[in-house]
């Protein structure tokens, strides 16, 4: 299987966890997009009933228009049964780096509230330790971004403000904030680093998702591999 086939395979495998009367948290990214498409097809064919998706606000309108998945906002639900999302890195203890799509704050809120959090990745996202390949996205208040860059130097991080593609200026999140991408030498204690980064004044949230994933479905050339905490 090539990478796209791996993504499709894990997206289909995640459908096995869907049952009637579920509220499903939905993230962003290309692999999650396949899952959302397949979930919409299941609903359309009547294979499951009374399914509602809860995506980050920036995705709500697009989901209603494109997928056929009924959508609710986070404040309209009392609980989320399952959340399904991708990741940029997954370490051996199922800690994650997420946030290349700049929706990390709302994704973390949704996934923290979920009864079960299922992560969909291809095998290239598996790493020996976090920050092996990808930086940690950090959502920051715009007025504080320069001060936070200086603060991150204490951690020996190579950090930079994420700039927009096909637009002038920095990337702006759905919350009106900026994103700093911080590449640390390595992260040996993800939970401690996640907490410590969030204590920096001006940081809204960061892309370390420690001790939150329950199941990781990994697309490999041989098929889908299931990892559990």
UniProtKB/Swiss-Prot annotation:
InterPro entries in UniProt: NagB/RpiA_transferase-like (IPR037171), Ribose5P_isomerase_typA_subgr (IPR020672), Ribose5P_isomerase_type_A (IPR004788)
Q: Which UniProt keywords apply?
A: Isomerase
Asked if the Swiss-Prot or TrEMBL record annotates the protein with the keyword Isomerase, the reply is yes
What pathway, per the record?
A: Carbohydrate degradation; pentose phosphate pathway; D-ribose 5-phosphate from D-ribulose 5-phosphate (non-oxidative stage): step 1/1
Q: Could you tell me one molecular function GO term of this UniProt entry?
A: ribose-5-phosphate isomerase activity
Catalytic machinery residues: 107 (proton acceptor)
Q: What is its EC number?
A: 5.3.1.6
- Residues where substrate binds: 28-31, 85-88, 98-101, 125
Q: Which GO terms describe its biological process?
A: D-ribose metabolic process; pentose-phosphate shunt, non-oxidative branch
* Taxonomy, superkingdom: Archaea
Signal peptide range equals none
Q: Mention any Pfam family matching this sequence.
A: Rib_5-P_isom_A
Q: Which reaction does it catalyse?
A: aldehydo-D-ribose 5-phosphate = D-ribulose 5-phosphate
Q: Name one GO cellular component term.
A: cytosol
Q: Does the keyword Ligase apply?
A: no
Instruction: Give the family, as the similarity comment puts it.
Output: Belongs to the ribose 5-phosphate isomerase family.
PANTHER family per record? RIBOSE-5-PHOSPHATE ISOMERASE
Q: What does this protein do?
A: Catalyzes the reversible conversion of ribose-5-phosphate to ribulose 5-phosphate.
Q: How does it assemble?
A: Homodimer.
Name under which the protein is recorded: Ribose-5-phosphate isomerase A
Whose protein is this, by species? Pyrococcus furiosus (strain ATCC 43587 / DSM 3638 / JCM 8422 / Vc1)
Q: Which gene encodes it?
A: rpiA
């Amino acid at each position: 299987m090539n990478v796209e086939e791996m993504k499709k395979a894990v997206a289909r495998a995640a459908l096995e966890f869907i049952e009637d009367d579920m509220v499903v948290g939905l993230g962003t990214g290309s692999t999650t997009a396949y899952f959302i498409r397949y979930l919409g097809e299941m609903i359309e064919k009547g294979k499951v009933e009374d399914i509602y998706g809860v995506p980050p606000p920036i995705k709500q309108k697009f989901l209603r228009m494109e997928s056929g998945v009924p959508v609710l906002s986070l404040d309209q639900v009392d609980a989320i049964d399952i959340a399904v999302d991708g990741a940029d890195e997954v370490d051996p203890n199922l800690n994650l780096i997420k946030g290349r799509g700049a929706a990390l704050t709302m994704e973390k809120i949704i996934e923290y509230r979920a009864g079960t959090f299922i992560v969909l990745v291809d095998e290239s996202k598996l790493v020996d330790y976090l920050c092996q390949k990808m930086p940690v996205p950090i959502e920051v208040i715009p007025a504080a971004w320069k001060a936070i860059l200086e603060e991150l130097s204490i951690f020996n991080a190579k950090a930079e403000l994420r700039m927009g593609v096909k637009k002038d200026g920095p990337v702006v999140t759905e919350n009106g904030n900026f994103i700093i991408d911080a590449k640390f030498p390595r992260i040996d204690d993800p939970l401690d680093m996640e907490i410590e980064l969030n204590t920096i004044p001006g940081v809204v949230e960061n892309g370390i998702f420690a001790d939150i994933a329950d199941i990781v479905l990994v697309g490999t050339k041989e098929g889908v591999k299931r990892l559990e905490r």
